Amino acid sequence: MYQVSLKQFVFLLKIKSTTMEPHRKHSVGDTTLHTCHPCRRTIPYRIYAVFHTCGIIALMYHHVHSLLTANTTLITSLLLLSDIVLAFMWATTTSLRYKPVRRTEYPEKYAAEPEDFPKLDVFICTADPYKEPPMMVVNTALSVMAYEYPSDKISVYVSDDGGSSLTLFALMEAAKFSKHWLPFCKKNNVQDRSPEVYFSSKLRSRSDEAENIKMMYEDMKSRVEHVVESGKVETAFITCDQFRGVFDLWTDKFTRHDHPTIIQVLQNSENDMDDTKKYIMPNLIYVSREKSKVSSHHFKAGALNTLLRVSGVMTNSPIILTLDCDMYSNDPATPVRALCYLTDPKIKTGLGFVQFPQTFQGISKNDIYACAYKRLFEINMIGFDGLMGPNHVGTGCFFNRRGFYGAPSNLILPEIDELKPNRIVDKPINAQDVLALAHRVAGCIYELNTNWGSKIGFRYGSLVEDYYTGYRLHCEGWRSVFCRPKRAAFCGDSPKSLIDVVSQQKRWAIGLLEVAISRYSPITYGVKSMGLVTGVGYCQYACWAFWSLPLIVYGFLPQLALLYQSSVFPKSSDPWFWLYIVLFLGAYGQDLLDFVLEGGTYGGWWNDQRMWSIRGFSSHLFGFIEFTLKTLNLSTHGFNVTSKANDDEEQSKRYEKEIFEFGPSSSMFLPLTTVAIVNLLAFVWGLYGLFAWGEGLVLELMLASFAVVNCLPIYEAMVLRIDDGKLPKRVCFVAGILTFVLIVSGYVFLK
């Protein structure tokens, strides 16, 4: 029989009550911590892939034959090139359908004495107190500090890359409030351990204790928001004498781009307890690395590497959780779920990280902007999980610290012994020599002539450091696991306007191209390191921006042909006509099936495919252009923080009603508006031609019809709406001019 101590039994009982899993039958003495099963749709998908591949080969034959016999060489070449890109991108998607798997973990069976649990370092990143409100950071920090996990094993590091005294003040307030919040959560087995979420819930406790805690939270929130609104921390608000001096560092010369290192221990598990002296408080450390205008800081990857070094000096926990500041913990048993994999003797040696999906709160009914990223964070993940494992998505990831120091069989030693991944820390985190070394490794020139960013830590060279780092770890031989419990492990906020969505994804497109066009390209280095299927799977993301080419060609060329009654597709009487129909229905049908099988709705899928088109005409296109200009040294790009603050009530109401929010004028809306106008004109003229001239250009008309239905929100924003979220008149006017130019140009090539 498997035996546990009384203390261990009580701790496991708490974990079991937080897992929210349905009852499962296990044999007596069964200590299996997790299981893995292949998806049932694998074989049918492989069979379909064979038939679809045959269809693509036939289509390529048709294109080549047309190219050799047709007079319109340019048009045929564009269609051929577009279909080559579409075929390649379909192949990348199919590689992720090759071996999808589902995993289940059993945290209630994780047996260890509380003192034997491994230490856990949590990294939370923020960069702007106005785009990422400090109270959001506070709630994320408190939610992980309150994990159902030995508190003395948890160390929370908050990286403030904006170097803001407002964020530091908010965390000081959080440290004081945590002494009431953490005991309350653990005594009452609270599931929602983000205070904002808990006190907004209709199911929360109304006891005197709960109401008292709520009053404390509202007082804290009021103080923090007052400080943020005023833009400075007034002396009257600093109630703890030991922290008064740290705010003197914010002098007139202090800027977000040029300032010294600030490391402040706000809570120490060795000394801090709640008022009843029954509960130990976890470590809470504020870190703002040194910045200089003459030194490269490598954006978020640089901030994470600083935390990796600072935590290595202070606590050096073997497990690291990375979180964005808006991604609060939604399940207090999450660390134990990760341990089911990270401590399994069968796989732990080569396991680099356990990735949880990103889940977003407040998503509209049918996810109008496709911000749940269902394919990115769920569908593709189970496909990757059957290969080398899921890619890293920037947050909600438990890392094996050893994974940042070379391949499983090839440890790369850091430049100083204090940063070795297996070192046991034997000094208090607030010891003078420990803090001195922590300040040193957070310096802006510390990484010069070291392996940081190239062979050690998070990797530099791409704006999407999460994708690039996970990819490089897989290339080195590390594996990963996708953990998707029924209760979401983490929840966050998503953009609520189209301009925020496409701006964020333009940055992703640029970063992914930086990987695709590099010495570590997935199609070459990736295939060599991980094998054909996994390497091609990584191309699904690296080549994101390439979607823009076929979308532009198919968004304009057939429609212009329709306006001039010049055929670019086979007519309905031609047998090749049906090949286009079958390939289109097959690709879209399989995409719909993927979506629905993973719990999506039909309306959600429709919006998802529409946003795929919108991205192709905006973020992917402009990302490709900006990357090209940067490669030619004609421009540079930086890292723009996506705003998580949403105080516009009217915008929120429109979002809930699923009305598109275009917002301010942006050049990224020009191609989108132009393609909407061109397709509407082509649809009207093609419909007239169908009745006036008989057979008509059916495929061209069907394509224009499909585009018009997808563009209905754009027509509404152009003509019918008068609210602030409508398309700006300037965009509509310029798009009208571009439409005229395209139609006139079409006469040259199509007549």
UniProtKB/Swiss-Prot annotation:
Gene field: CSLG3
Record-linked SUPFAM superfamilies: Nucleotide-diphospho-sugar transferases (SSF53448)
Domain of life the protein comes from: Eukaryota
Compartments (UniProt record): Golgi apparatus membrane
Membrane spanning stretches: 47-67, 72-92, 543-563, 577-597, 617-639, 674-694, 697-717, 731-751
Protein keywords: Cell wall biogenesis/degradation, Glycosyltransferase, Golgi apparatus, Membrane, Transferase, Transmembrane, Transmembrane helix
Role of this protein: Thought to be a Golgi-localized beta-glycan synthase that polymerize the backbones of noncellulosic polysaccharides (hemicelluloses) of plant cell wall.
Entry EC no(s): 2.4.1.-
NADP keyword on record: no
Active-site residue list: 161, 466
Family: Belongs to the glycosyltransferase 2 family. Plant cellulose synthase-like G subfamily.
GO molecular function annotation: cellulose synthase (UDP-forming) activity
Protein name from the UniProt record: Cellulose synthase-like protein G3
This protein's GO CC annotations: Golgi membrane
